Amino acid sequence: MTKYALVGDVGGTNARLALCDIASGEISQAKTYSGLDYPSLEAVVRVYLDEHGVSVEDGCIAIACPITGDWVAMTNHTWAFSIAEMKKNLGFSHLEIINDFTAVSMAIPMLKKEHLIQFGGGEPVDGKPIAVYGAGTGLGVAHLVHVDKRWISLPGEGGHVDFAPNSEEEAMILEILRAEIGHVSAERVLSGPGLVNLYRAIVKSDNRLPENLRPKDITERALADSCIDCRRALSLFCVIMGRFGGDLALTMGTFGGVYIAGGIVPRFLEFFKASGFRGGFEDKGRFKDYVHGIPVYLIVHDNPGLLGSGAHLRQTLGHIL
């Protein structure tokens, strides 16, 4: 008889839940709920389990916020809870709450070739560190290493490191944003809101007033080639994505590959392919040759957060991935 566990991927707006076959890791019965419609994550879980008529003992839910102890307070939502209390209330034997990019990193060993698009470099080296990052509402970062037949995710808040410009245009962006917001992290330029920041800074650098555009508007105008400022912003976004990925590669020697997740890049995939992304990735001066062979992949799996939550839980329960 198939034994299932509950897996989840929760962001600031939606909560996506599914079942994971503990033996195979297969994800099924995925359903998305609006977080605004429920008073707590526990309430969403109860609705999901009731709707699907299943009883589970184990669960792993990825959440887009730092996980530092038993108490979880979401960054972009009002939900806050004790992991131990939620586990007790649901009657689970095992419940883990993990960072969303911990889940994405743990999905990487489970991905197949059709789930990936490669951007330069050679083949990944088995056993070497892996980096994963992605721009969405924010900028998520994690690393993954393989030790003693176990995958170990190394989460953190790498999206909040300093934005490090390496061209006159990027230095201009930093100067304008610093005057507006003070500290300028990488996330301030590599995210949906970050794309807006890039556009606004480009326009303001020419002593003009920027329009009140959303990330979607900027992307659409750039792809339609109807706004030179939007096209410059999107082009610069791609280059800075490359620079940041190259920084991750240097920091951990990620010869196992660098992986891009998140919801932004797939929206302008052809533009990204033709952009200066790989040039930015390899623009490391004396260490250009060091990163030249490191492959970069875009993850195109529909639910890497769910897949990775399941992988994390299965490994915790003793399965070898």
UniProtKB/Swiss-Prot annotation:
Its EC number is 2.7.1.2. Its main location: cytoplasm. GO terms for cellular component: cytosol. It comes from the Bacteria. One of its GO terms (molecular function) is glucokinase activity. GO terms for biological process: glycolytic process. It catalyses: D-glucose + ATP = D-glucose 6-phosphate + ADP + H(+). SUPFAM superfamilies: Actin-like ATPase domain (SSF53067). ATP binds at G8, D9, V10, G11, G12, T13. It is found in: Cytoplasm. Keywords: ATP-binding, Cytoplasm, Glycolysis, Kinase, Nucleotide-binding, Transferase. It is an enzyme of class 2 (transferase). Pfam families: Glucokinase (PF02685). InterPro entries: ATPase_NBD (IPR043129), Bacterial_glucokinase (IPR050201), Glucokinase (IPR003836). Belongs to the bacterial glucokinase family. NCBIfam families: glk, PRK00292.1-1, PRK00292.1-3. HAMAP family: Glucokinase. This is Glucokinase. It comes from Salmonella typhi.
